[in-house]
Amino acid sequence: MAGGVWGRSRAREAPVGALTLTALTEGIRARQGQPQGPPSAGPQPKSWEVKPEAEPQTQALTAPSEAEPGRGATVPEAGSEPCSLNSALEPAPEGPHQVPQSSWEEGVLADLALYTAACLEEAGFAGTQATVLTLSSALEARGERLEDQVHALVRGLLAQVPSLAEGRPWRAALRVLSALALEHARDVVCALLPRSLPADRVAAELWRSLSRNQRVNGQVLVQLLWALKGASGPEPQALAATRALGEMLAVSGCVGATRGFYPHLLLALVTQLHKLARSPCSPDMPKIWVLSHRGPPHSHASCAVEALKALLTGDGGRMVVTCMEQAGGWRRLVGAHTHLEGVLLLASAMVAHADHHLRGLFADLLPRLRSADDPQRLTAMAFFTGLLQSRPTARLLREEVILERLLTWQGDPEPTVRWLGLLGLGHLALNRRKVRHVSTLLPALLGALGEGDARLVGAALGALRRLLLRPRAPVRLLSAELGPRLPPLLDDTRDSIRASAVGLLGTLVRRGRGGLRLGLRGPLRKLVLQSLVPLLLRLHDPSRDAAESSEWTLARCDHAFCWGLLEELVTVAHYDSPEALSHLCCRLVQRYPGHVPNFLSQTQGYLRSPQDPLRRAAAVLIGFLVHHASPGCVNQDLLDSLFQDLGRLQSDPKPAVAAAAHVSAQQVAMLARARGCPRGPRLLRIAPRPARPPPVFADSPFQRRSVAGRWGCSGPRRA
């Protein structure tokens, strides 16, 4: 009914106070046959004079029970699944338009509720209690109970609220809703949820009004939390609950009502984001969610993100929200393939800026780790992994228990679970008290270096680097174990893996520089000399991260081996200077003459690289190594092989690569001729051999823009 009795009374401009609580209650009890008297609960409001035009309205409120007593059974009662949205979302049957009797009675109940609340507007909490008493009396007169008609009352309010004027009528409607929610929060939530999907302006305002009422907002939030978890409810129920939570949590001060179940609510929202990310895109969900969107959320995922932001901000976690925005965490949370990365970023931000909730989160996570629901289990695993960065939180469980759980994940067939386990082992390695667990950590981390999934290899490299940062790190053991495993990763096809592997080598050299300075011929020295050529060539890597990581690692090697070549290394890295590279090769040939054949063999392999800058860099490096090598250092077979490969490279489609190969081939030919010259008696060799002319290479077209200014290097040194 459009506006109900309230709409008619407003049309006649009758004052809202025309009816009093006493008049209503006495009229109801008189029709029920009870003795008249004052209401038993709440303060006695001041008696107002009842105007004559109010009497027909009072009669209209109770007319259904007298005129058609049989129609009382047509009011729908709460079923066994009051929160189900299936029936609410079904289209209405076709046929001639009629106003159902149940809708008419809902309107009458809503009229009574609105009038009563308006009369009690000044009575505060006592007025709310009196509102409930009056509604109960009205229903008892018809042989019904209030708890059975909450759905009907809320539906009636939803029908009449759009036609109410701002001010006292609107406040009366909100008071009725609060009065019902105080005693019947679950029924009110279940009745409002169908109007939240799709979004409804009236329902949104009612959710916000419940949020502002500190007596009921906690109960309503709890019911929405259970609806969001929705283990037995359909999916639309969780979506509607997400939108309702977004409306309520956006109200200032509402987050305080979540005390006691804040971690539970946060995990439920993040898990809901995981479910939304894994489900097919709904029609209202954009393919790309933009953080700059303003106004109402454009999708269920963005609505959940806004609810999560409001939950964090309302509890003083504004820095968590800011960190997530700067790191792109919110965008990752809504992505199907990046959700767990977003969870890890959220956990890291909370460890840094919201540690007062970590204990509660950790306790709520533990039972979820064994959940049969994949989104819930994986989200809990990611949170568990991220929270291990907090030492006080990690101490809530025994070290052995955490380690056993993480190692168990390494045997899971799902790569994502193994990846999370490796990340957890990396966080565990940062704890200085885990020295005795190194022998257990290492096999799992080293074994992951052979995985095909880039996430697993990257996590293992990161964990090994963290392990090296610990005091008393097992440098010699790691050097021996990484000897056969690390060099292949320096040439991995994945940019991130190359950069991480080179960085791990640099960290290893920095931690073991004491033994290297003493000249110890251990596994670390062997590993560095084996990796020297890849590091020099990776200075020209198309990936900036890999190139910068190589430069940093070579600087660590220069410091540990006392080469005195830092200026040359920086000049080669940023200016691709042939003069600096020539000086560098001369020093290496003088320091390690026995390794020159290995250097040349390694460089020869890069002549077949699919990357143009690396092919040219390899040709140039061969030219300078051959130029500075003595004839007796290189055998004829190696020279022949180099000459053949450089000859094939002279037909390279890139002119710069072909030109460099031509110059280096000439150097190989000159070294071969010098090696083949007859030596003669020692006394007759008075005149020195003629010096071989140095190679001259053109400037590289692949040179990147230099950032050498931050190193304090003004430019290449010219001869």
From Swiss-Prot:
Keyword Repeat found: yes
Placement of HEAT repeats on the sequence: 356-393, 397-434, 436-473, 477-514, 527-563, 594-631, 633-674
Region Disordered, annotated ranges: 25-103
Signal peptide residue numbers: none
InterPro entries hit by this protein: ARM-like (IPR011989), ARM-type_fold (IPR016024), HEAT_Maestro (IPR055406), Maestro-like_HEAT (IPR048465), Maestro_heat-like_prot (IPR045206)
Keywords, comma-separated and alphabetical: Repeat
Origin: domain of life: Eukaryota
One GO cellular component term: cytoplasm
Keyword Repeat carried by entry: yes
A Pfam family the protein falls into: HEAT_Maestro
Name of protein: Maestro heat-like repeat-containing protein family member 6
Annotated organism of origin: Homo sapiens
GN (gene name): MROH6
